[in-house]
Swiss-Prot record:
Source species taxonomy: Bacteria, Pseudomonadati, Pseudomonadota, Gammaproteobacteria, Enterobacterales
Entry protein name: Small ribosomal subunit protein uS17
GO molecular function, one term: structural constituent of ribosome
Protein's job: One of the primary rRNA binding proteins, it binds specifically to the 5'-end of 16S ribosomal RNA.
Membrane-spanning segments: none
């Protein structure tokens, strides 16, 4: 069993909540029959303690203990700020 902490990168799609953001994670999946690669998106609720994220920011997140019913990811750092 490994104790490696799971980290992902994604784009912030909503920052309307207090201390929380919604991050969209894009991944490419191969179609089982036709072999074409399809883009799949997963939306995760992420804990943002200092409200430092904005819409469109690219962020790095890590898996953590459950903080609420839907939040079990926490913000590590803002990789790239969105251009307004």
């Amino acid at each position: 069993m490994t104790d490696k902490i799971r980290t992902l990168q994604g784009r912030v799609v909503s920052d309307k909540m207090e201390k929380s953001v919604v991050v969209a994670i894009d991944r490419m999946v191969k179609h089982p029959l036709y072999g074409k690669f399809i883009r799949r998106t997963t939306k995760l609720h992420v804990h943002d303690e200092n409200n430092e994220c904005g819409m469109g920011d690219v962020v790095e997140i890590r898996q953590t203990r459950p903080i609420s019913k839907t939040k079990s990811w926490a913000l590590v750092r803002v990789v790239e700020k969105a251009v307004l």
